[in-house]
Every structure is written in C-alpha cells, then in structure tokens.
C-alpha cells in the first residue's frame, strides 16, 4: 500500500486507443498524445502517474492566499451588513478594498528557502527543479519543462522570438499536424524536405562567421588571403567600385588618421551604395550578386573601424550618428547577433551621453539640442526594434527616460508625456510633412513596443518564476484576469492605429519611406500578438479547466488577428511589384509566410485560394530574383545570399504545405488547383506546380546537400540509439521520380537523379517506412499546445 501512496488515481478506460498504445501497453496523456491518437482523435491518459511533489525550495511561513480569502470574505460580510443609512462613501470604500485585494498575487511574496538552495546538489539547474512540471509550455509549441534532451530557450531562439517555428519544438508541432491530416507519400516528402532544409541550413553555417571572428579575419578566410590587416584593408578598398567611391562626398577636413574618420567614410560609402536600391532608380537592373559583393566589402570596412573606435573615442557622438545610419541601411541584411553588437553600443553610448535626460540639454544651443533629440529617438527605436525581432528584453529602461520629442514632431500636436492612445488621437497627420510624420510613426511604434514588452511580456506580475512554481492554481485566476485587461488595452491601441494611421500610410505608400514604416507597423503587430499569445498560453496552462476555457476566445482572437495582419502585409508588399523591394522585405517575409502556413494547417477549410495565391506569387518573385541574377545557387560565401537562398527554399516548402492542405480540405485534384491559381497569373500557377514537385530545383539543392551538420548528427544519434537496425548510417542513393515531369517557365524541375547521403537512409526509405509515426515520436517531444478542445483539421 505504501508504494501506491504517491500514485494518482486511475481514470476509466478510454473507448478508443491507438495501436501503439495497445502494443506498448500504455495509455497516452491527452496533453501529450502519440501520432496514432492524433490521427484517430482519441484522448487517452497514462495510468499510475506520480503526483507532483510539493516544492521544497520555498518558505511557507503562512498561507497568504487563505489570509486574503478570509479578509475578502470578512469585508464582503461587513458590506452586506451595513444599514441602509450607511454613507455611500463607506460602501464604495469597502468595494474598492475588495478590488485591490483581488490584485494581490500571493505567489510573488514567497521567499526561497536559503538552506534548501545552498545545499542543493542535483544535476539539473535549480530553476528546472523549482519549476518542476507545474508549467508545461513557454509558448505555442514548446514543452520546455518536460524536455529531458535540450535547452528549449537558447540564445538564438529567445522566449518570444518570431522564429520559434523553426526550433525543434515548432517543427515537431508542424510535423504532427501534417501526419494527423494525412500519412501519404506527398506528406512524407514534405516532412523529409523540412528536415533536409534544417540539415542544409545548419551545414551552411559551418564556415567562418562574422559573429565569431574579427571582421578582417572573416574577410581573409572567405577570400583565402593571408596577409596583414593593412594589406587586407587595401585589398578591400581596391575592390570597392570606383563609381561608389566617386559619388561619396569626402569632407576635406578628414585626414583619415583616426579610426572614426575611416568608419564615417565607410558609412558614407554604404549610403551611396544603397541609393542604388531606391525604388525610383531600381528600374535600372542592378545585379544581385554585384550588389551583395560590394555591400559585404563596405560593411567589413565599417565593422573593422567600428571595433577600433570602441575604446579610442569614448565620448565622441560622431560614431553614434554613423551607427544609426549603418542600422538604417543594414537592418534588413544582417544577422541579429551582428546588429545586436551595434545596437548595444548605440544604446550604451546614448545613455552615457545623457541623450535620454532633459537635464543634459540645459545650457546647450538649440540646434545642437535638436540634433541630439533626433539622435536619441533614433537610438531608442533601434533598441526596441531589436527586441521585436529577437523577442528579448530591451536595453534602455523606459521608466528612466525623459527626453522631449523633436520640435517638428511636437508641431504635430503631441509630446513625450502622452501615452499611446493620446498620441494616436491627437496627432495631426499632414501629407505635406512626410518626413515629420514618419519620425512620429517610429516614436509611436517605439512606445507601443515598450508597452507590450514592459507591460506584459517581461512584466514580473505575469512572468515571475514563483507564479509557475506553486501548485495553488486558484491564486492565478486574478493574474489571468489582469492579464486580459492589459491584453485588451494593447488590442485597442492596434485598433486605433488601424483606424487612423494605417489608412494614411497606405494612401501614400508610393513613398518608399512611408511604406517602410508601414511594414514595420505590420510586423510589429504580428510579433506583439505572437508574444502575447505565448504569455497567455503559459498562464492558461496552469489554470483549472473552467478558467482555461475562458481564455480560449482570447487565444482564437490573437491567432486570427495575427493571420489577418500577415495577409495584409504580404498583400501590400506584392502590390509594389518591385522585385528589389520584395528583396529588401526578406528580413520579415519568412515569418509572415510561416504564420499563413500555420493557419492553413490548423483551419484548412476556412482558407481561401487568394491566400494561397499570395504565397505562390511571393515564391515566384524570389525565384525571379535569383534567375535574373543568372544562378539560383550562389557559389560565393556571402552571408546574406546564403540566408536569402535558404529563405527561398523554406518558402517553397511552406507553400507546398499550404497547397497540400488546401487540396485535401477542398477535395480537389492538383490540376484543378493549378487552374484556380492561373486566375491570378501564369507565374502564380507555375509556382504552385513547382512547389508540389519533389524535383523542383529548390528541393534538389536541399536533398543534394551532403555536408555534415550538428542537426543531422543529433538526429542520427537518437535514431541509432532508439531504433537499432531499423535505421542505419549506410549511404543509399535514390532515383528522383522522373515520370514525365512538367517543365515550368523559369521553375523547371531537375531531370536528373538525386543522390541522397547518410540522413534518414534515403528519401525513398523515409516515405515508405511503415513506422514513420513511431520514428518521429522518438526524436522530438510530443507537444500539443493550443486552443482547448480544438478540432484537428477543422
């Protein structure tokens, strides 16, 4: 009997369980079902699960929760017993006390047990033990507190990263959804392509990276050079176009004897180079390869002298101006880790210079003060932008910031003391003052991102570890209600923007700067709503069933708004019909395409062919960009070209997923789909055909990737350990299906056989394996997060 004290009460048998459950003589947890149960839509539970132990890391000196309940009950009774003659102010005061008591979060007042913490000698981190298994999710996909294999929140995939879909938990979620809808050959081919994409993209980062070595060392390794730094700089300068250097206005006072001089010269070269991508001048064909080669040369020069300037010009604001200019031209090209180094320097230097405080402006002449105000709000914006694209907390503390808006912005009827609602309501947008309105737009966007990140995503009242470590779920009901209040405020802010600011931006979107601001607003909405969804799911997971259901409508609304915002921004980007402008939007397009794909996966019957046409038109545009450059597969080592190539490949895979989900939900043949897509243009139909053809050239590049990668090694290791001789490391070639493959304009599939290396045996073995669901269960945690009681394939 003693052995059974720690066991949970067994639940009744389920009426339907999958073969895998019967074979292994287990029942699967409804929160962690196997693929078979997903496919049969069964809900099973494990038997003999151990109860969670009460946490031993906290000092429970008393039950604050019970004390609060007693106090609220006493006040409620007192209020009910008041005579009719009692003053109204007394009744109101008692009601206010009850309201304030509701806001108190007992968990936040728990203290750690110092003896337990100091004597802890376990293998897992203290944080892991404190949380235990009370909390099951950090976001829509992850199961971080049940994983025994890896750290789910990494330096790259932050807590609120918009690219969480590409983490292993996100891919696991997508894979299970696809398998639950269909386990046919085409679905398995899609899964294989996704796995191979991750493998190939991991392998592409095996070479030298600008994030891990000095700029000149990076340049020398890429070009196979072995010489001193001065010679390398001369080599870079000699390869920069004379046209770019000739168009750069050099201040005659610059003697180029300081690192700052060289850095600012590099910034001016970058400004001239990027003028070639101006929408008005882009009609003149600029070869992609040439642009990227020149861009990397100039940026390498800038980074080298940026590093040399770090300790030689501690209080020189000249470099700060150069860094702001560099961010404006490079934010859509570089890896976030590279940009993070620049932005962290900008943020620290702007604070050290006192640009964030009004006290430092006293005694300055107005022209200098105005220049510094503009500089400050630029630095503030890029700090918030970085938080948006990485999901990480900002560096600049908003509560310690007090700086006036630039004079021209104040002239629009606003000032720095106003909140987001007031700014939107009072601003007087003037089409004759585009530049000023754009400046206001970035300031407003900065304040909105601050409200979301400081007020919600990194607010201790919603994210403190104590909230997720204590088993008393009823104490979280008040937290959940307050979270909904804050969420409603953010929704209203974005609705106000949609009603007033977005129509203005769309009306004048022919102005490239206006449209750039519009895309920032659209992407910010997507990221903010994704982050809020993750936070709500984290809280929702700890509530009782009734309270959980109350949050379902909120989660549904978030996903709908995220999807609609993604469709809007993709539609408007495509309206420009400017290949190079679409090229510049690549920094956020992949996340947008993934959002649309998730909607196709979850609710395929609700999706229109017009959404699918957007996906096809976008991948056709990226394909045209590479074709116009003369080569789909770049042979060089340019970092951005690799990122663009990988992004285009995954865009084709995502479009393939959407096409498959749509044809199945509509019970439509592929030929009928192509006819429907043809209504949106021949290129749209061609792109759809290419996406569904396993021999498409973009898939050939993925399948033909033979480089070793950590991803491949990890998967093979798990398969070898768990599957034995079912899967082995032999190199098996496979013939690509070559049956009268259609030839599309510009998107022709490969007509040659495809050789597949030592990963998952081969494409043919992978798609014909009888145990694919079991195989996939082995190397990813089974996670199923989302709306309560959702219907698969609805």
From Swiss-Prot:
InterPro entries: AtrR-like (IPR050987), Transcription_factor_dom_fun (IPR007219), Zn2-C6_fun-type_DNA-bd_sf (IPR036864), Zn2Cys6_DnaBD (IPR001138). Zn(2+) 1 binds at residues 18, 21, 28, 34. Zn(2+) 2 binds at residues 18, 34, 37, 44. GO terms for biological process: DNA-templated transcription; positive regulation of transcription by RNA polymerase II. SMART domains: Fungal_trans, GAL4. One of its GO terms (cellular component) is nucleus. The keyword Nucleus applies. GO terms for molecular function: DNA-binding transcription factor activity, RNA polymerase II-specific; sequence-specific DNA binding; zinc ion binding. It is found in: Nucleus. Pfam families: Fungal_trans, Zn_clus. This is Transcription factor TOG1.
């Amino acid at each position: 009997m003693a052995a059974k004290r720690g066991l949970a009460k067994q639940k009744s048998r389920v009426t339907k369980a999958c073969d895998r459950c019967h074979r292994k003589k287990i029942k699967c947890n409804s929160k962690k079902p196997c693929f078979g149960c997903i496919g049969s839509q069964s809900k099973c539970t494990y038997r003999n699960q151990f109860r969670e132990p009460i946490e031993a890391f906290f000092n429970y000196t008393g039950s604050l929760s019970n004390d609060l309940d007693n106090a609220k009950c006493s006040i409620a009774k007192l209020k009910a017993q008041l005579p009719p003659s009692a003053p109204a102010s007394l009744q109101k005061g008692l009601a206010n006390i009850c309201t304030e008591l509701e806001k108190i979060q007992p968990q936040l007042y728990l203290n750690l047990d110092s003896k337990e913490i100091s004597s802890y000698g376990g293998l897992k981190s203290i944080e892991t033990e404190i949380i235990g298994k009370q909390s099951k999710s950090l976001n829509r996909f992850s199961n971080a507190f049940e994983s025994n294999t890896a750290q789910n929140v990494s330096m790259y995939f932050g807590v609120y990263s918009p690219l969480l879909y590409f983490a292993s938990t996100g891919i696991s979620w997508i894979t299970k959804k696809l398998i639950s809808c269909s386990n046919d050959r085409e679905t398995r081919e899609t899964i294989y392509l996704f796995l191979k994409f991750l493998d190939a993209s991991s392998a592409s980062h095996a070479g030298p990276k600008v994030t891990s070595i000095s700029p000149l060392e990076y340049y020398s390794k890429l070009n196979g050079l072995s010489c001193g730094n001065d010679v390398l700089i001369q080599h870079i300068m000699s390869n920069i176009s004379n046209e770019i250097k000739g168009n750069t206005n050099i201040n005659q006072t610059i003697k180029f004897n300081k690192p700052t001089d060289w850095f600012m010269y590099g910034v001016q070269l970058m400004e001239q180079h990027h003028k070639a991508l101006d929408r008005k001048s882009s009609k003149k064909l600029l070869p992609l390869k040439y642009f990227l080669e020149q861009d990397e040369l100039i940026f390498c020069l800038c980074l080298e002298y940026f590093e040399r300037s770090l300790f030689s010009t501690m209080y020189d604001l000249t470099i700060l101006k150069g860094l702001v200019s560099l961010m404006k031209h490079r934010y859509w090209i570089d890896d976030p880790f590279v940009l993070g180094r620049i932005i962290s320097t900008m943020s620290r230097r702007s604070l050290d210079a006192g640009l964030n405080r009004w006290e430092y402006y006293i005694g300055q002449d107005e022209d200098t003060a105005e220049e510094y105000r503009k500089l400050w709000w630029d630095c503030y914006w890029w700090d918030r932008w970085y938080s948006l694209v990485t999901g990480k907390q900002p560096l600049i503390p908003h509560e310690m910031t007090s700086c006036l808006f630039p004079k021209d912005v104040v002239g629009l009827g606003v000032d720095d003391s106003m909140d987001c609602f007031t700014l939107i309501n009072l601003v007087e947008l003037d089409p004759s003052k585009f530049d000023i309105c754009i400046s206001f737009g970035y300031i407003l966007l900065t304040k909105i991102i601050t409200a979301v990140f400081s007020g919600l995503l990194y607010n201790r009242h919603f994210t403190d570890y104590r909230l997720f470590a204590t088993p008393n779920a009823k104490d979280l009901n008040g937290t959940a209600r307050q979270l909904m209040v804050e969420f409603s405020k953010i929704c209203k802010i974005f609705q106000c923007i949609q009603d007033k600011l977005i129509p203005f931006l769309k009306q004048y979107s022919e102005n490239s700067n206006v449209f750039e601001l519009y895309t920032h607003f659209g992407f910010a909405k997507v990221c903010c709503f994704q982050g809020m969804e993750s936070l709500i799911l984290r809280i929702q997971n700890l509530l009782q069933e009734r309270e959980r259901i109350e949050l379902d409508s909120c989660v549904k609304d978030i996903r709908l708004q995220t999807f609609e915002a993604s469709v809007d921004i993709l539609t408007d980007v495509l309206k420009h019909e400017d290949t190079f402008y679409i090229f510049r939007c690549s920094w956020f397009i992949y996340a947008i395409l993934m959002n649309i794909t998730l909607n196709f996966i979850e609710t395929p019957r609700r999706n229109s062919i017009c959404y699918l046409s957007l996906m096809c038109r976008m991948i056709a545009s990226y394909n045209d960009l590479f074709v116009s450059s003369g080569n789909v597969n770049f042979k060089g080592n340019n970092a951005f070209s690799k990122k663009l190539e990988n992004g285009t490949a995954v865009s084709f895979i995502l479009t393939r997923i959407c096409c498959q989900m749509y044809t199945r939900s509509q019970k439509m043949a592929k030929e009928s789909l192509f006819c429907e897509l043809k209504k949106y243009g021949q290129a749209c139909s061609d792109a759809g055909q290419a996406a569904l053809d396993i021999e498409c050239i973009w898939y050939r590049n993925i399948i033909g990737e033979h480089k070793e990668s950590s991803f491949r090694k990890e998967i093979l290791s798990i398969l070898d350990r768990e599957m034995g001789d079912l899967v082995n490391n032999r190199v098996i070639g496979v013939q690509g299906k070559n049956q009268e493959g259609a030839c599309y304009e510009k998107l022709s599939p490969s007509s040659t056989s495809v050789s597949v290396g030592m990963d998952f045996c081969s494409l043919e073995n992978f798609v014909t394996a009888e145990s694919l669901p079991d195989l996939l269960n082995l190397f990813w945690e089974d996670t199923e997060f989302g709306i309560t009681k959702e219907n698969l394939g609805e």
